[in-house]
């Protein structure tokens, strides 16, 4: 009886489960599939988020470098603009200075011309006095120049004997110096000739000896082939005699 009761209860439980599935309309397999799809979707989302973070990190240095370049370009551009403004201001100032100088030169040219006219009039009135004074000065300078030339000629004539004596001594000294030099050359020539003769004789002897040794070696080399040829002929004759005897 108990076994029957247990079996009947299990059947009732299974029937209740089937009824619940029918009421829900979802099977356990479908639930597992949905759960797996959810897990896969979450995993994919996690991967995509990591990729996006990496791209953002890669973009951040690029943006920082761009910002730094912009900062560098900013001061450089400002400096260039400042230089251009300074150059324009300098050109304007130079133009103004040149205009002022032109005006000043024009203003100064008129008084200079007036001064020149006044100076010419003054010089015209003052010229006769110097012209009158020049003949007296020239007449005083001529005797002084004549006296200087006479004193110079006297001094040269007084010093001429001493100069001649010095020149004679200078000429004698080179002659005396040349004579010992000639003697030394005469004494040194025999020794030099002996040395040169020995130096020339040694190479000649060496060349003769070398030529003799070469001739000897050539003669030995020539005799060697002849001896070998004779030995070969003797061997051939002996072989022929042996063949005939056989």
UniProtKB/Swiss-Prot annotation:
Q: Which residues form the IQ domain?
A: 32-61
Lipid modification (S-palmitoyl cysteine) maps to 3-4
InterPro entries per record? IQ_motif_EF-hand-BS (IPR000048), Neuromodulin (IPR001422), Neuromodulin_C (IPR017454), Neuromodulin_gap-junction_N (IPR018947), Neuromodulin_P_site (IPR033137), Neuromodulin_palmitoyl_site (IPR018243)
Quote the protein name from its UniProt record: Neuromodulin
Q: Where in the cell is it found?
A: Cell membrane; Cell projection, Growth cone membrane; Synapse; Cell projection, Filopodium membrane
Q: What is its main location?
A: membrane
GO MF entries: calmodulin binding; lysophosphatidic acid binding; phosphatidylinositol phosphate binding; phosphatidylserine binding
Task: Kindly state one GO CC term assigned in the UniProt record.
Answer: postsynaptic density
């Amino acid at each position: 009886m108990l076994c029957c009761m247990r079996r009947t209860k299990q059947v009732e439980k299974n029937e209740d489960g089937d009824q619940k599935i029918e009421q829900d309309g979802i099977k356990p397999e479908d639930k597992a599939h949905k759960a797996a799809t959810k897990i896969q979707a979450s995993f994919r989302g996690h991967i995509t988020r990591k990729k996006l973070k990496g791209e953002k990190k890669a973009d951040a240095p690029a943006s920082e470098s761009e910002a730094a370049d912009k900062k560098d370009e900013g001061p450089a551009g400002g400096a260039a603009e400042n230089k251009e403004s300074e150059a324009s201001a300098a050109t304007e100032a130079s133009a103004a200075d040149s205009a002022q100088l032109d005006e000043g030169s024009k203003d100064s040219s008129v008084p200079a011309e007036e001064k020149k006219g006044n100076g010419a009039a003054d010089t015209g009135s003052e010229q006769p006095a110097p012209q009158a004074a020049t003949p007296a000065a020239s007449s005083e300078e001529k005797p002084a120049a004549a006296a200087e030339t006479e004193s110079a000629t006297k001094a040269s004539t007084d010093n001429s004997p001493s100069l001649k004596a010095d020149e004679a001594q200078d000429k004698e000294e080179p002659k005396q110096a040349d004579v010992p030099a000639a003697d030394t050359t005469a004494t040194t020539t025999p020794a030099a000739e002996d040395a040169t003769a020995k130096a020339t004789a040694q190479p000649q002897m060496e060349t003769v000896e070398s030529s003799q040794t070469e001739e000897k070696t050539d003669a030995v080399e020539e005799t060697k082939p002849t001896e070998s040829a004779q030995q070969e002929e003797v061997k051939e004759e002996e072989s022929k005699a042996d063949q005939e005897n056989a």
